[in-house]
Amino acid sequence: MRFTISLITLALVVSAYGSLAQSVSGVVTSDGEPVLYANVFLQGTQIGTSTDEFGRFELKNVPSGKHQLVVTAIGYAKTVKSIDIAAGEALKIDIEVKEHAAQLEEVVVSGTMKEVSKSQSAVPVEVYSAQFFRANPTPSVFESLQNVNGVRPQLNCNVCNTGDIHINGLEGPYTMVLIDGMPIVSGLSTVYGLTGIPQALIERMEIVKGPASTLYGSEAVGGLVNIITKKAVSAPLASVDMFGTDWGELNTDVSVKFKATEKASSLLGVNYFNYQNPIDRNKDGFTDLTLQNRISVFDKIDFNRKANRPFSIAGRYVYEDRWGGDMNWTPEFRGGDEIYGESIYTNRWEMFGIYQLPIKEIVNFQFSANSHKQNSVYGNTPYNANQYIGFWQLTWNKSIGRKHDLLVGGAYRYTYYDDNTPATSSGDASVNQPAITHLPGLFVQDEISLSENNKLLLGTRYDYNSIHGNIFTPRINYKWNSKNKRNIVRIGGGNGYRVANVFTEDHAALTGARTVEFNGELLPETSWNVNVNFEKKIYTDNSTFIGLDASAFYTYFTNRILPDYETDPNKIIYSNLNGHSVSKGISLNADVSWYSGLKLLAGVTLMDVSVEENGEKFRQLLTESVQGVWSVGYTFTRIGLSIDYTGNLYGPMRLPLLGELDDRAEFSPWWSIQNIQLTKRFNDRWELYGGVKNLLNFTPPANSIARSFDPFDKNVVFDNNGQVVPTPDNPNALTFDPSYVYAPNQGIRGFIGFRYTIR
């Protein structure tokens, strides 16, 4: 009897305990739909379960107190919720998860000039979010691209640190830079116009590698970079992003959103960059980093219209004062021949917008205009230039049946360019003759859906250049994808043309270290390109995502315009290539995300860029054969701490020498720039970040600037033909030359900054 009573008592106690045991239950959804078979568990415990066919879950016997509730599922981003469960509580919680960033149907516009999901685009488009660039914060768009595979910011001068953007080994003039689809950064601004775009206003960057001339015109031969700015409606109310380095650099981005009118929202952004601390670590007597004082103001107004028809107007103003040179240089020596300095004043404004006509058909009018004024001296050589560009474009998008999606457009571009060089003077050099170019054009594109998994894109463009006449640029693209869109093959081909302007594209032509010579009239370059792209997405059983993107490319040039630095050390000779040039290679990008939160982005490009002239083949100058990039990130969710490790690696490049006696290396070494950053997130508003740039402290050799101690060649002896004569004081027959440059002279440095955002 006592035994029976004891059993009953024990059962009652156990039952009472069970009724008081804590539990957590709920439903996991995404966009209102249940997520089946998701993993739901308490971090740091063995308590876990999976959702059923209705997305439901229940965790039993949960210890009371605070926990991290983790949800993972194939194709979805890891989600962590903080819970606090009291003794005896049966907690109910519904969890919304988001698709994995690599799984999301990103909307792109650069490939076909209209909004489509990335997986549906017949043209391969790479998309890089603002978060990607935050892993290695930089003060300019130019520097931010250093961790994009196949893209390299190339410095062109050791003194003023100007640069351009190379894609797949092709120089900057072959890359078109757009802002919201408009050709803003071009011509004169390709040298100094890539700075001052406020990073806080950038939504994403889209990169197309290969010709896009059919839709965007002549400069998109090598590829394009399209900077997509945020829409006012989706931007935060206000944000501040400020960081500085122990070299004395200070960069500030400020943005604010406000209602301009009842139906218009405005997004105002200001970028300010200041560096006024001359440093000469390599002891060559010259500044390692150009001193800069720059301010940029950007404003974008979005109008709310019926049927969500787009209407926006944006503008930007940039002023910059930069100089580099002898450490003893001051503004009083500007333009003289006592102490060498390169001083550049830039005044630039831009305006662009889009308006969809209020009619039944989808007809968009786009426009842009910009003015670029440069007042500069390179030693005692002045270079003053004015450029005005006006552009408008009208496009009509029409679907015909279920298979044809037509895009028809007309465009006109006006370019005015004037400077103080022989490029804009009459034949006798006594009368100024600005260069004015009219470029009307028509283009048509048909995207044909052959089947659910096959798509064909046909396009052609006709331009009439007021100087060079008729120009045709056709293109063809084909895309196949598997039913689940996890395997995609794209094949594309097309041609392009380009009219070169030496003084707006090649900084070496301005330095005064060499005279410029033209060998005959420069004809437009033409190119033919073929590329193949394969994209694969893999989802493993342990919620790991692997994205692979492989490409092969081949571009064949005729009439290519290349600067000849080697025939005469005192000249840069420009002429059309008497032969051909080839750029070919392969690339691979990998995007791997583990359920633990670790993320890896890595890529490698192997390429061969060569020139063949008069039966002789040689490598193109300043072009690497191997490039690697990586970005590794991990977030410690519980403490709100993230770590990012980024870097790049470049193979040897052939460098420009001044002659056979030049003792500088003919090829650059293997070199790498690596960075690390820690970010502490305090709440939804505050972030503190800091780290180290150029961890390996890599810099080029100290003798990169030839004869930096004699920049005006006052102690150089020349013969009657203008050739340098070796002397005891100049045994290598050198002249002053700052164009031997392949990497920044700025070594290791620390940085710290903060972000404050009001949403």
Task: Please describe what each predicted stretch is.
Residues Y275-S296, D302-V363, A369-Y388:
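Flexible loop and strand-edge segments within Gram-negative outer membrane beta-barrel domains
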Residues E58-N61, H166, M182-K209, V297, ...:
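Short acidic/polar hinge/loop motifs at secondary-structure boundaries
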Residues T29-E33, Y37-Q43, T72-Y76, A86, ...:
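Short, acidic, small-residue-rich periplasmic hinge/interaction motif at the N-terminus
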Residues S449-N453, G547-L548, F553-Y556, N576-L658:
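Gram-negative outer-membrane beta-barrel transporters
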Residues L91-E96, V141-S144, G163-H166, L178, ...:
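N-terminal periplasmic accessory domains that precede
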Residues S186-L188, L201-E203, T214-N226, K230-R281, ...:
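Outer-membrane beta-barrel translocator/receptor signature
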Residues L600, L649-L657, K680-R759:
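C-terminal beta-signal and adjacent terminal beta-strands/loops
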Residues I362-S376, N481-K483, R490, L523-N576, ...:
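Membrane-embedded beta-barrel scaffold of Gram-negative outer-membrane proteins
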